[in-house]
Amino acid sequence: MERLLAKAFRKVALLALPAVVDTESLKDLIGRPRFLPESRERTAVPGVASGLAVTGMGGDVLFIEASLLPGTTSSLTLTGQLGDVMKESAQIALSYVRAHAAEHGISPEQLEHPLHLHVPAGAVPKDGPSAGVTMTMALVSLLTGRNVRAEVGMTGEVSLTGRVLPIGGVKQKLLAAQRAGLTDIYLPQRNEPDLDDVPADVLADVRVHIVSDVREILETALGPAHTSSAVAA
């Protein structure tokens, strides 16, 4: 915000004074928004979850999409230029879902079909374990027909038993969540000390939920079930 205001002031200083800045002229001074909130649109169907990531440009929101495909052979397709660690995270997420299907109201028949996980921005390479909880959420959302709430973002590695493990880049990820309009963020318990590095204005805009198990996210981040329990993303 400070950088945008400074940019506007520099441009105003070049104008004939006195100058009046209103809503319309402010758009011309600072340009089009770099970050457009899209979580509500993207998570409008079951099978899509909003994760938080760190890129070379800082923090970003990473959407994970899950789809159930026709067929009778169980398999997992991964797309989006994912690195080896991220591919392993997807396999772990699916193994957790399979092992705890009954607990989360998922029928065994659904897991007999092929599944596809995709991370958009396919031209951009992606890697790391921190999308594990987001992949788990996308799969459970798809297979239960329950949307992930649009205001929810999350980050964390997931284990086969559902433990949420620590990740890096907490400050950058929460800044990205604030820009994207996400207000409920799930963060690994062991990352709680990292909140000391997050600006106060960011923490004022988001509610950080500290979790140690993926079940804690599943209990509160999903909306009501749709009439169809398997809706493709």
Named regions from a protein language model:
Residues 18-24, 32-50, 57-233:
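Peripheral, non-AAA+ core regions of ATP-driven protein-machinery
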Residues 2-14:
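C-terminal helical "lid" of AAA+/P-loop NTPase domains
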